[in-house]
């Protein structure tokens, strides 16, 4: 009578929400130079929109300085424009095929704005984790209704799903706390 319920798919989907959150948080400016800061920048190149890292090498030159080595000399202008138009508040200095980007210190107001954005990303990740939990609970209810599992199994699996959900929500909170600390650090 007992069909087995596999929680590994739910864990994989919840892990995907955490990975997305970490990727989004990595793109938030903290006042320190990191190559991931320019990940959201796309350049209009060769008739299409390409990620910056597909037309240039991004490296950290100093604690507050990024260096962007453009591979094609004709792409320097479009790369410069893409970085300026990216809403990151960055202004590159062009030196031949290299763009130097000084990362200005964040003022208090900008730090608070970044923290709010980080909170928004974290809340979206929590919602995604809860959606996965709901899908798992719905699957359990369907299995119970179809008499594929008993009530005891349904309750046991529901408790297991809740435990995993709590674990992943905790991971979201940890990632948010670490990013907030990094953002607020002067």
UniProtKB/Swiss-Prot annotation:
Pfam families membership: RRF
Subcellular location field: Cytoplasm
One GO location term (cellular component): cytosol
InterPro entries: Ribosome_recyc_fac, Ribosome_recyc_fac_dom, RRF_sf
SUPFAM superfamilies, per the entry: Ribosome recycling factor, RRF (SSF55194)
Alphabetic keyword roster: Cytoplasm, Protein biosynthesis
GO molecular function: ribosomal large subunit binding
A biological process from GO: cytoplasmic translational termination
Family: Belongs to the RRF family.
HAMAP family: RRF (MF_00040)
Function: Responsible for the release of ribosomes from messenger RNA at the termination of protein biosynthesis. May increase the efficiency of translation by recycling ribosomes from one round of translation to another.
PANTHER family (alphabetical): MITOCHONDRIAL RIBOSOME RECYCLING FACTOR PSEUDO 1 (PTHR20982:SF3), RIBOSOME RECYCLING FACTOR (PTHR20982)
NCBIfam families, per the entry: frr (TIGR00496)
Entry protein name: Ribosome-recycling factor
Organism this protein belongs to: Beijerinckia indica subsp. indica (strain ATCC 9039 / DSM 1715 / NCIMB 8712)
Upper taxonomic lineage: Bacteria, Pseudomonadati, Pseudomonadota, Alphaproteobacteria, Hyphomicrobiales
């Amino acid at each position: 009578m007992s069909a087995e319920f596999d929680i590994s798919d739910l864990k994989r989907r919840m892990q995907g929400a955490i990975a997305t959150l970490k990727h989004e948080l990595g793109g938030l400016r903290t006042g320190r130079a990191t190559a991931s800061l320019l990940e959201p920048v796309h350049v209009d190149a060769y008739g299409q929109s390409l990620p910056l890292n597909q037309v240039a090498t991004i490296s950290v030159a100093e604690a507050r300085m990024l260096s962007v080595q453009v591979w094609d000399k004709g792409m320097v202008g479009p790369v410069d424009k893409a970085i300026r138009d990216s809403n990151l508040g960055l202004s590159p200095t062009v030196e031949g095929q290299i763009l130097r980007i000084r990362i200005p210190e964040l003022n208090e107001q900008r730090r608070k704005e970044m923290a709010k954005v980080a909170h928004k990303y974290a809340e979206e990740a929590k919602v995604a984790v809860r959606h996965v939990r709901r899908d798992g609970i719905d699957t359990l209810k369907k299995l119970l209704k179809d008499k594929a599992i008993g009530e005891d199994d349904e309750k046991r699996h529901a408790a297991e799903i809740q435990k995993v959900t709590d674990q992943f929500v905790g991971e979201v909170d940890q990632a948010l706390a670490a990013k907030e600390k990094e953002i607020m650090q002067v």
